[in-house]
Amino acid sequence: MSQDLRELVRSKVVIGDGAMGTLLAERGVGFGHPYARANVTHPEMVAGIHEEYVRAGAGVIETNTFSANRFKLQIHELEDRVREVNEAGARLARRAADSAETGDGALVLGAIGPLGRPLCPVGPVTEEEARSVFLEQAEALLEGGADALLLETFTDLVELRLAHEAVRRFGVPVLAYKTFVEDGETLSEGLPGRAAREISSLGVDLAGANCTVGPQRMVGIIEGMAAEVGPVAAYPNPGLPQLVDGKVRFRRDVDHFALYGRKLAEAGARLVGGCCGTTPEHVKALADALRNFRPENAPARSVGVRTVEEEEPEEVLDRPATELAEKLKTGFAVAVEVDLPRGNDITKVVEAARRLKGRGVDAIDISDGARARLRMHPVAAARIVQEEAGIEVVAHISCRDRNIIGLQSDLLGAAALGVKNILAVTGDPTQIGDYPEATGVFDTDSVGLVHVLAKMNRGEDLAGNSIGDPPGFLVGSAFNPTAEDLDGEIEKLRRKIGAGAHAFWTQPVFEIGALELALERLGDLDPCLLLGLMPLRSARQAEFLHHEVPGVNIPKPVRDKLSQLSLEDAPKYGVEVAQEILSKAQPLVNGAYIMPPASAPDLAGEVVKAVSTQRSAVS
C-alpha cells in the first residue's frame, strides 16, 4: 500500500523494520553467499522475514537489496543478474507488505547502498558510471513494486549526491541516510547538523542516520540533525558488534533498544527502525514503546530548517608550511634520494644527509619500500633524519601496503611528527619484491592519495570529519616526461593537479630534448617540477635501467660512451651527463631531484656543485 511518506511522518512516529542479513545468516545463508542473492535462491525465507517484521509492528520495510548493485554483485560473478535480484527483492517485500495476514499493509522502500568502490579521484569510478549503477538498481526496484527509494549507509556525501541525481527522475519519494561514527568529536564539531543540511538541500523527502552506532549514541546524532532540518529517520544497531567463533554477534537487549528508541523519537526521529543485528523482537519492543507516542507531545525543541547555501563557508587556505615549499616558490630547490638499509639502524643515512646538507641540498627523499622491498617506515626514518641531520625530508607514501584508513592514520602521524613534505605514489607490485605472496592493498592510487592529502590540508579526512588544524602538507607526486604514452601521462598529471598536488618529482631524464618535448605538450599546464637526475655509474647499470625498468630511457650515445669507460671513469661521466642536463633544464624547472646509486649517495654531491653554481641565475 503506497502512502505519502511526508504526510505520514508529520502525524506520527512510523516504525521501521530491522536487519535482514542478520537473520539470513542465522537461518543458514552461508558465508560467501551474498545476502541479496537470497531473493532468488531463498525467496520464501526472505519473504518470511519481511512478514515477521510487519507482524512485529513495522509500517515501513526495506527490500533485501542493500548490496545488489552491479559492482557488489560482480564480486560473486552475478553482475548480469542485477535486474533479476532487485526485482525479486522488491516483489518479495511487496508481497509481505500487502498480505492480509500481516495487517493493513506497509510501505516498501527499495534499498540502495553505496557502490562498494571509491569514486574518482580516490578510486576508478567516474561520476557518470556511479549514476548509471544507481539508476540500474533503482529501475529494477520500482519495477518490482517499491513505493519509494532508500539511499542508506552512505559515508561519502558526494556519492550520496550522485545516487540522488540518478534516482530522483522517477518522481517517487526518496529517503537518504548517512552513517556516523559517534566518538564525541562528531557531535562537538556539529557534523550531524551539517550533513543533514547538505542531504536535505538535495531535495530528498527524509534525511536520516543508520548503522555503525547503537541507539544511545545515535540520540545525539539525531538531535543534531533534527535541530537543523526537522523530522528525520533513525535506524541504529542494537550496540557494538563482537566476533564470536568467527561470526559477528550483537547483544539482544531489546528493552534497552526500545527505551532509546523512544528517546530517538523525542530527539526528532519520525521514522525509527533498526539496522545490523536487530530482529523482529527489537522491532516489536520498539513498536510497543512508541505505541502512544505523539510528536506534538514531545519535549519542545528549537528547529530551524536551513539549506547549505544559506551558510557562510569557512575559508580554509591550502598553504604548504615547509621550507622546501618556500624554496620552490622563491628559488631553485634540490632534493636527493637516500636509500634506507634493511635493518633499523639508519646511522649511515643520517650521516649522508648531513654531508649532503653541507653540499647545498635542501631536502632528503626517503622512499616507501621501493620495488616492494622491506624497509623502515619512511615517516619514522624522516623524523630521525630531520632531527639528527637538521634537514627537511620528503617522505614517499605508497598505496600498496595500507588501506584507506591506514594511509590517513600514517599521514596524521606524519603531521604530528613534523614530516610535512609528502610524495604520493601508487607503489610497486608486491610480486617483484621481498614478499611476492604479500597482499597489495591499493584501495586508491597516487591521484586518490593526492586528493586525501589535499582534503587534510583543508582540515578534513576523506569522510569529511574535522581533523583540527590543517597540517600544511607539501603535496608531491610523480610525472614521467619520457613516458611512452605521453598523452596518458599528461592527462594523469592534469588529474593530480586537479586533486590538489603542489609539485611533481620526475622520473630520471637523460636527454634534454625529451624534457623540452614534454613541456611543450603540457599546453596550458604549468606544474612545479623537480627534474629527476640519476648520475650513472656504469654501462651495466645504464643497460639495466634502459631495458628493464619501465619509464626510464637512456640515449644510445650515453650507453655507448659508458661502455667504453673504465669503472673509475664511468661515474665521472655519469655526473657530467647529469650536470649538462641540469644546466640546460634549470630555466625550465623549479628544482632538481637527484637519485644517486644506493651505495654512493655522495655522488649526488658532485651534481649539486653544478646546481649551486647555477642558482644565482634564478635567485
Residue ranges, per PLM feature:
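Domain-level signal for soluble alpha/beta catalytic cores
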Residues: 1-619
